Regions:
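Aliphatic-rich helix starts adjacent to a transmembrane/signal segment
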Residues: 32-51
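N-terminal leader/signal peptides at the extreme start of proteins
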Residues: 1-10
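Conserved amphipathic alpha-helical interaction elements at protein-protein interfaces in regulatory
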Residues: 3, 39, 58-62
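Extracellular/periplasmic head regions of type IV pilus-like filament subunits
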Residues: 54, 60-127
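Alpha-helical hydrophobic helix detector
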Residues: 16-32
Length: 127
């Protein structure tokens, strides 16, 4: 039987150390990635609700009453097919799974809602 000497290659210990380092880096990156998605979704909701609130205000000026549905704003928006993002977002300082599939209008307060909440409810708690 021949013995192999001076051959370059990876040892099992070396491979385990490399895999361990990659696993540690993944554990650090995944929560930051999840947080970034929730922040992006929150920013999108804030933007959509602000845009809808502006359209509602202009609609009220033109028509003297609040719109009943988002589709009533078709002359004031590029598209009335605005939908909330899916996944997590920050609502009242907590990370929550977004359940809304559409934005709605609160006629009593003349504002757009997502998950029954106004734009002011979507924020991340400051640390």
């Amino acid at each position: 039987m021949q013995t192999r000497q001076n051959e370059a290659g990876f040892t099992l210990i070396g491979m385990l150390i490399a895999v361990g380092i990659v696993a540690i880096l993944a554990l650090i990156a995944v929560p930051k990635f999840t947080s970034a998605i929730a922040s992006a979704n929150t920013a999108r909701i804030q933007s959509d609700l602000s845009t809808l609130n502006t359209a509602i205000a202009v609609y009220e000026i033109d028509n003297g009453k609040a719109p009943k549905e988002i589709s009533d704003l078709k002359d004031y928006l590029q598209s009335t097919d605005i939908k909330p993002p899916t996944g997590d977002c920050y609502m009242e300082g907590k990370t929550v799974k977004l359940e809304a599939t559409a934005y709605t209008i609160d006629q009593a307060n003349s504002q757009a809602l997502c998950n029954g909440k106004a734009v002011g409810a979507f924020y991340k708690e400051k640390k």
